[in-house]
Each structure stands twice: as C-alpha cells, then as structure tokens.
C-alpha cells in the first residue's frame, strides 16, 4: 500500500485502498473500497473514511450499501470476464436498476472493453472501472482512445 501511495503521490493521482481497512486507517488514507459483507462486519470504517466504495451485484445490495454509508458503488461484473469465468454477469439492465434505486454514484466494472462499452451509453453510470483489459493491453493510450471512440 505504501508503494502504491508513493506512486499516486508522484503522479498526483488519488489512491483508493481496497479490502484492507486497517491498513487504510493506519496509513491515514480516508478512501476505501470493499465488498458489502466486509462493510457489514467493519462498520467502524465509516468514522475514518471520506470516500467509501462498495462492490454490489444486485439492487438489494446497492440499497443496503447506500444505507450503510457507501459514497459510491461499483456494480460488477457487468459483462462476461476472464477474471470470473464461472460467475454469470449481472448485465446492463441490473446496472440500470441499481442506478435508479440509489442516489450515490455508480461505476460499472467487469468485462468493459471497446466492444462492450457502447452498451453502457444510455445507462446513468458515473463511469467505468477497467482492470484486465487495461492491464493486458500492449498500448494503454491506444486502448483508452478506442474506449472513448
């Protein structure tokens, strides 16, 4: 975490730590991302975090996360992804329903590629989160340009 924080500081980027809440508190990082079950068992995080993202997969989870104090949601995984080949994607309609059900920003994650991103065009998401595609592409600027096209 310290290394990631240094890199973010050098490049003037925001760092949001994930899953290790005690580390975020110890390092005085008030931005954290976790699963709903983690938040349910670590509700004291709310006292330390100014930004609290929660991963959700259903409308019910989204509503509960918002009630528990989430400041944004990560709806996943929207499309099929190599990271979770045996788990069915939640789909675009579920992401739309999540956006309608909550007042906080929702980001789409999972299987978002240049081929799938257009399916999110009319969904009221705040943005998308990229993982595998970005980490495995040989040309990051080109990949990002293709996503924005």
State what each model feature region is.
Residues 1-17, 36-39, 43-58, 86-114, ...:
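Alpha-helix-loop-beta-strand connector modules within alpha/beta enzyme cores
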Residues 5-10, 44, 66-69, 121-124:
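Acidic (Asp/Glu)-rich catalytic clusters
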Residues 16-17, 33, 53, 72-74, ...:
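Conserved beta-strand positions in the central sheet of alpha/beta enzyme cores
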Residues 22, 27, 37, 59-76, ...:
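Alpha/beta enzyme core
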Residues 29-33, 46-52, 70-71, 125:
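Active-site regions of enzymes building and remodeling cell-envelope glycoconjugates
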Residues 36-44, 74-86, 114-148:
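Glycine-rich phosphate-binding active-site loops on the catalytic face of alpha/beta enzymes
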